[in-house]
From Swiss-Prot:
Function of the molecule: Negatively regulates transcription of bacterial ribonucleotide reductase nrd genes and operons by binding to NrdR-boxes.
Mapped zinc finger ranges (unnamed): 3-34
Pfam families noted in UniProt: ATP-cone, Zn_ribbon_NrdR
Source lineage: Bacteria, Pseudomonadati, Pseudomonadota, Betaproteobacteria, Burkholderiales
PROSITE patterns (UniProt xref): ATP_CONE
UniProt GO BP: negative regulation of DNA-templated transcription
Protein name as it appears in the record: Transcriptional repressor NrdR
Gene name of this polypeptide: nrdR
Residue span, ATP-cone domain: 49-139
InterPro entries: ATP-cone_dom, NrdR-like_N, RNR_NrdR-like
CC cofactor note: Binds 1 zinc ion.
GO molecular function, one term: DNA binding
Cofactor(s) recorded in Swiss-Prot or TrEMBL: Zn(2+)
Alphabetical keyword list: ATP-binding, DNA-binding, Metal-binding, Nucleotide-binding, Repressor, Transcription, Transcription regulation, Zinc, Zinc-finger
NCBIfam families documented for this protein: transcriptional regulator NrdR (TIGR00244)
Length: 159
């Protein structure tokens, strides 16, 4: 594999591990020319459905867009990168399981929101506010109230 730093063609695998979700192999590589190290991921190439946008146009499913949108919602939140990768892998699996050749962008957005809900409630609210185009504070309050009803009441701990 070509080194991303010096473009030399000769690199060696220093370490190889299966990712947490088992969907990828993480490899640490070292360039024999510049001695720098870098990480690569090996994944199965899947034939995911095309995404049909709101305007009717179609585009290829892009894992990087899903990861980027989740990372933006999770910015400065205590969620590991492996957890994001696992969530995206679950979304891909759900899309493959449908057997459909196309998926509407609205459905894809709902899948992302469901995964964020399980990862971090703040990120879920952030994503939902953009995805659902919240107009005022009451819409935030509605989502927060939805969480309160869904989760059991927590009693404050005595100190």
């Amino acid at each position: 594999m070509r080194c991303p730093f010096c473009r030399h063609d000769d690199t060696q695998v220093v370490d190889s591990r299966v990712s947490e979700d088992g969907a990828a192999i993480r490899r640490r590589r070292r360039c024999s020319a510049c001695d720098k190290r870098f990480t690569t991921y090996e994944r199965v190439e899947l034939n995911l459905p095309a995404v049909v946008k709101k305007d009717g146009s179609r585009t290829e499913f892009d894992r990087r867009k899903i990861v980027a949108s989740m990372q933006l919602a999770l910015r400065k939140r205590p969620v590991a990168a492996d957890a994001i990768d696992a969530a995206v892998a679950r979304i891909e699996y759900q899309l493959l399981a449908t057997g459909e050749r196309e998926v509407r962008s609205e459905k894809l957005g709902e899948l992302v929101m469901n995964e964020l809900r399980g990862l971090d409630t703040i990120a879920y609210v952030r994503f939902a506010s953009v995805y659902r185009r919240f107009e005022d504070v009451s819409e935030f309050a509605d989502v927060i109230e939805e969480f309160r009803r869904a989760s059991p009441a927590k009693t404050p701990r005595k100190r």
